[in-house]
Amino acid sequence: MPNQSITLRTIQSVTPDPHRDIYVWDHRLKGFGLRITPRGAQSFVFQYRVDGGPARRKTIGPVGSPWTPATARKEAERLLVQVYQGIDPVEAKREAKRKRRR
């Protein structure tokens, strides 16, 4: 799908493809997008690369309370800052979880 601004109207207008996930990428914020599954579930996602490595995706959360396009975009901005600092958000979360278990 083409890049567009992720808004409530965008979310309501996208119809699922019965055979594959659909991704709609935000044209204002690099890596921020919306994933729609074949069953119609919608989630905000963030796609990134750390130091030229492979592309990775992190699910921010499902569409709906508390995740609005605005709150999800702010979270994606926070994650983008981590990526620019060379921090992999997925690995940082895993490491924090490992430390809590010890």
Language model segments and positions:
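Basic/aromatic DNA-contact patch characteristic of tyrosine site-specific recombinases
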Residues: 1-102
